[in-house]
Amino acid sequence: MDLYGEEPMETRRSDFGMRLKQCMDKYGPLCVGIDPHRKILTDWGYNVDAEGAELFSMRMLQAAHGRAAAVKFQTPMFERYGSRGFAALERVLYAARQMGIITIVDCLHGGLSTTISAIADAYFKPGAPLLADAITLLPYYGARSLSGLIDEALDNGRGVFIASLTSNQEGASLQTAIRQSGEYKGKTVAYGIASTAQKHNADIEGMGSVGLIIGATIGQWIKDSGVDPAKFTGPILSPGYGWQGAEAKDLKTVFRGTSGNVLVTVSRFIAAHGPDIAMLSQATESIALDVRQALLEATEEHHAEDDEESSAFGRATETSTPLTFVPVDGNGAQQSSAATRQPSDPAADGE
């Protein structure tokens, strides 16, 4: 039993993905971001302190309850208040658990093996002070450096989201850089991260528990990365919708062909309607519907194009000899069969 009197539950490595998928199927693909910015606290008439951040968070939880699949807490917004801020985050995480809401802590942790156990103690293990369903990770030490922490999460029925293609413009130069060595030599950094993450989901039936962060604002940049979200079987956390500029058309561009595993996070776009709980709830419901429809159209358009291509190919083969496809590289030169990307590779771009 932990300090809040909660009994630990028997867990499986696939638990987080299963629970998140159930909530997404029931409530839609919206994750409400709980980010107590100074300006929002002031606009709401709350004190800019730990107490104000906690009051704001509790109100956002009420709006999200029964209307969104998950909530995401931005830890720096609590860290700025020191120990009182962390205590506030503990309490709102506990409240979310009591309400049955899936929680994601956006802490962007990472590091060496010496720090992994400490992070697991804080977020994953029974009795953890900041017990969450999932946290975000930063793979700058190398995606494989996260393996131990991922195992800790999965062994405790939790999940992770690894930053792969972020919504900030500064990320492009690093994330689309070509790797010079290792297993994914010649591929982009983002491709290597996505492929490494997918390995943890490969043997899981249904949606896995190791996810990616792919921003909704990246647009056609998704093609430069070599990452195909449609071939990734874990959850995808997507910031950038609303306040940061992404619209429904951007979701359809980036997540074309995906099938129910994209979780769109929206924070200030919802919070701007507060503090009135009725207005917050209405905004949450409206945005949830918009996001669901955009992602549904992304899937349907992809399938429609595939059906059209299949029909055209069928008509062509009725009157012509069998076609032989010769793979080419980006410069139009033929590749050897050894260099051909396999369809089963989850991070391969959809060509």
Residue ranges of model-derived segments:
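Conserved N-terminal beta1-alpha1 strand-loop-helix module at the mouth
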Residues: 3-73, 79-91, 97-98, 102-104, ...
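Acidic (Asp/Glu)-rich catalytic clusters
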Residues: 24-25, 61-67, 93-98, 150-156, ...
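Conserved, mostly hydrophobic/aromatic
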Residues: 32, 71, 106, 135, ...
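Active-site mouth loops of central-metabolism enzymes
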Residues: 40-56, 109-113, 177-185
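Catalytic beta/alpha-barrel core
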Residues: 72, 80-81, 104, 133-142, ...
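Conserved anion-binding
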Residues: 111-211
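A C-terminal functional module that forms or caps the active site or interfaces directly
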Residues: 212, 217-265, 269-270
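C-terminal helical cap(s) of enzyme catalytic domains, especially alpha/beta-barrels
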Residues: 251-257, 261, 272-306
